[in-house]
């Protein structure tokens, strides 16, 4: 606990410097962080190899190994991500709106940093770099607690990034990593209200639920993605197949991957054999309801548990629905509020789906894989918020700020 309190104190001190840092000072730090990342790439890759070897010994799935894996190209992408942040507008100090009251007071609403952000995440070392860069650009100090699976990678990345921050003249404690990966330390971090202003968990359902349940620090819930694609009776089959294959197989272990497929009963007999064959060619295990099993052989029966499960693997659950209303009802019951899609050429059905599905991102005729800060034009993101308070959807720089009111007067009293 002493180590945590020390990190909290240092982060709080750093946050007071960062909140007043100029855009050029922050951008200089980001550039130097990217440079140090590449200068240390051989060391980082060697440390990442240790994590990969440990993960393989534990029987980690291929999809999860892909999340953990770093090579020169991925490190270059991470450094490029830091440089892209340099080109994004600095939200700090922006006056969102201003108005004048009848008594002459001028009242404005201005963006300011959150302060100290805590991030608890799993085996994705790229998150270490993304989080550090985003928090710094938005004027926040950050305390990271990554998973044990990526501890060697994270230590190496943070060491390099901190060298860049220190060289720029900003406080080196703007970025800190908790190297103790025990659950007890994570629980203590969740209750560090005196120092941490907001906590953001990134990972699977178990991690996020544990943080939401145990934290006394305010939490922005992110990431669990039980995403659906509904194929309407008026869908273009070729478009539907392309979208489903992309959404399921391009990167199955990410939160915006498709997990469930809903098919209108009027097209099921024609469409299901085609799409299941295409999925199997990509080595996807298909689980279906009893209606699906009657149409296609060798489909594993889906259980009630399947409908609410995020697989993060080459597995998909398929259900036949009577109509769009049943599809929407199913999605709102079992979905995680992340990303949902409809494939249809019917305008009325597309609008009904957009209006009635309760999710952060709702698509018409496009893959759920686009729910991403860069794809939305925000630059990198800290995560995908699935809650409704403060932020919803991809969380870019603006979502890492809060606001304060600034009031100009000329002697008014009340």
Curated annotation (Swiss-Prot):
Its main location: cytoplasm. InterPro entries: Ald_DH/histidinol_DH, Ald_DH_C, Ald_DH_N, Aldehyde_DH_dom, G-glutamylP_reductase_CS, Glu-5-SA_DH, GPR_dom. Its EC number is 1.2.1.41. The keyword Manganese does not apply. CDD domains: ALDH_F18-19_ProA-GPR. Keywords: Amino-acid biosynthesis, Cytoplasm, NADP, Oxidoreductase, Proline biosynthesis. It comes from the Bacteria. One of its GO terms (molecular function) is NADP binding. It catalyses: L-glutamate 5-semialdehyde + phosphate + NADP(+) = L-glutamyl 5-phosphate + NADPH + H(+). Pfam families: Aldedh. GO terms for biological process: L-proline biosynthetic process. Pathway: Amino-acid biosynthesis; L-proline biosynthesis; L-glutamate 5-semialdehyde from L-glutamate: step 2/2. It is found in: Cytoplasm. PROSITE patterns: PROA (PS01223). One of its GO terms (cellular component) is cytoplasm. It is an enzyme of class 1 (oxidoreductase). The keyword Membrane does not apply. Belongs to the gamma-glutamyl phosphate reductase family. PANTHER family: DELTA-1-PYRROLINE-5-CARBOXYLATE SYNTHASE, GLUTAMATE SEMIALDEHYDE DEHYDROGENASE. Catalyzes the NADPH-dependent reduction of L-glutamate 5-phosphate into L-glutamate 5-semialdehyde and phosphate. The product spontaneously undergoes cyclization to form 1-pyrroline-5-carboxylate. This is Gamma-glutamyl phosphate reductase. It comes from Clostridium botulinum (strain Eklund 17B / Type B).
């Amino acid at each position: 606990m002493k180590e945590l309190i020390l990190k909290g104190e240092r982060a709080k001190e750093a946050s007071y410097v960062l909140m007043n840092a100029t855009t050029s000072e922050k951008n200089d730090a980001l550039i130097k962080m990217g440079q140090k990342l590449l200068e240390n790439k051989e060391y980082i890759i060697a440390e990442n190899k240790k994590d990969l070897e440990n993960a393989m010994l534990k029987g980690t799935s291929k999809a999860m190994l892909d999340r953990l894996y770093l090579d020169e190209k991925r490190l270059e992408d991470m450094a490029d991500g830091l440089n892209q942040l340099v080109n994004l507008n600095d939200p700090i100090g922006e006056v969102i709106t201003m108005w004048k009251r009848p008594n002459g007071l001028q009242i404005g609403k201005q963006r300011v940093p959150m302060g100290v952000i805590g991030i608890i995440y799993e085996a994705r070392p790229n998150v270490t770099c993304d989080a550090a860069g985003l928090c710094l650009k938005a004027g926040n100090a950050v305390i990271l607690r990554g998973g044990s699976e990526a501890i060697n990678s994270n230590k190496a990345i943070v060491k390099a990034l901190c060298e860049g921050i220190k060289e720029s003249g900003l406080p080196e404690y703007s970025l800190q990593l908790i190297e103790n990966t025990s659950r007890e330390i994570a629980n203590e971090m969740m209750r560090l209200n005196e120092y941490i202003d907001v906590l953001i968990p990134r990972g699977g359902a178990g991690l996020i639920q544990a943080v939401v349940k145990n934290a006394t620090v305010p939490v922005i819930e992110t990431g669990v993605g039980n995403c659906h694609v509904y194929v309407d009776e008026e869908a273009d089959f070729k478009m539907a197949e392309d979208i489903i294959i992309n959404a399921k197989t391009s990167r199955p272990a990410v939160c915006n991957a498709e997990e469930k497929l809903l098919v209108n009963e009027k097209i099921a007999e024609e469409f299901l054999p085609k799409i299941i064959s295409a999925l199997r060619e990509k080595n996807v295990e298909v689980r279906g309801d009893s209606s699906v099993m009657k149409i296609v052989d060798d489909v594993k029966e889906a259980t009630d548990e399947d409908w609410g499960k995020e697989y993060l693997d080459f597995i998909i659950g398929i259900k036949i629905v009577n109509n769009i209303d049943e599809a929407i009802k199913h999605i709102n019951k079992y979905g995680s509020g992340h990303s949902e899609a409809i494939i249809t050429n019917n305008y009325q059905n597309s609008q009904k789906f957009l209006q009635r599905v309760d999710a952060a991102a709702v698509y018409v005729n496009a893959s759920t894989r686009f729910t991403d800060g860069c794809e939305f034009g925000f630059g990198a993101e800290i995560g995908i918020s699935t809650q409704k308070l403060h932020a919803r959807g991809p969380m870019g720089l603006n979502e890492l700020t809060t606001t304060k009111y600034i009031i100009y007067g000329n002697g008014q009293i009340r």
